[in-house]
């Protein structure tokens, strides 16, 4: 079975293919926004399918894949099909709070999804009272003994970005970001100076390195298109260009807003 027009095969837990040398299987957490490398996100889990996912990986310190749903694709056994890229997530500050599981998601390596493994059960709407994971497992374990409540992906890692960050290019990107922050501060009549903004940005991004590039991208790339392109990027310049064009758009938008309110 193929996922829509994408060349992404879909399997169930009884017909998982032999993996290629570079492939691994990871749980997929499908959300409505991407997490980029070096970015962080506080998570609250209450659905049984994702509680099962965390049970499967937390004790062994394994990652899962953070992906975003693709609205142009048909659902997979009641679950949204994701775009074909994502990031591996390492879990930190894991804790239970009542019936919820809380943790800090840390964005790591990028990956591409080659195939999907569908969940053993179609998700149901349970209002505010959820059944236990064990109760749901009992519904499918005889037919799909290796099944899971969540979608899994057969993935391969995307290589690190190639190239070096040019210092002048980096300084220009930071200057654009500072200009944007200055305009926002003026619109909101915030009591900050250009020096305050300059120091804050320089402290956040002290040196032009790949980690800093991804952190800057996480602040600026807020559209699905830009985030997807960054996750598929092969070299540093591609990400720099995405950052530059998106800051320019933001600056143009807030300038128009300010002019319309003068």
State the predicted function of each range.
Residues 2-262:
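N-terminal low-complexity, acidic/polar interaction/targeting segments
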């Amino acid at each position: 079975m193929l996922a829509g027009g994408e060349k992404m095969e879909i399997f169930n837990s009884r017909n998982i293919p032999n993996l290629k040398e570079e492939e691994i299987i990871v749980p997929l957490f499908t959300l409505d926004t991407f997490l980029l490398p070096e970015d962080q996100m506080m998570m609250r889990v209450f659905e049984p399918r994702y509680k099962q996912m965390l049970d499967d990986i937390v004790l062994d310190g394994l990652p899962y894949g953070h992906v975003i749903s693709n609205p142009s694709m048909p659902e997979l056994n009641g679950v949204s099909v994701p775009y074909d890229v994502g990031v591996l997530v390492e879990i930190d500050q894991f804790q239970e709070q009542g019936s919820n599981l809380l943790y800090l998601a840390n964005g790591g390596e990028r990956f591409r999804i080659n195939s999907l493994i569908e969940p053993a059960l179609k998700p149901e709407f349970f209002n505010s009272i959820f059944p236990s994971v064990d109760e749901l497992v009992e519904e499918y374990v005889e037919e799909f003994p290796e099944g899971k409540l969540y979608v899994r992906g057969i993935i391969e890692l995307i290589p690190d970005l190639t190239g070096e960050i040019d210092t002048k290019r980096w300084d220009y990107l930071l200057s654009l970001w500072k200009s944007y922050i200055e305009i926002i501060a003026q619109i909101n009549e915030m009591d900050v100076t250009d020096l305050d903004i300059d120091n804050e940005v320089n402290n956040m991004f002290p040196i032009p390195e790949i980690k800093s590039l991804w952190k800057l991208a996480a602040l600026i790339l807020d559209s699905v298109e830009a985030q997807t392109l960054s996750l598929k990027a092969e070299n540093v310049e591609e990400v720099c260009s995405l950052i530059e064009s998106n800051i320019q758009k933001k600056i143009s938008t807030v300038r128009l807003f300010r002019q319309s309110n003068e």
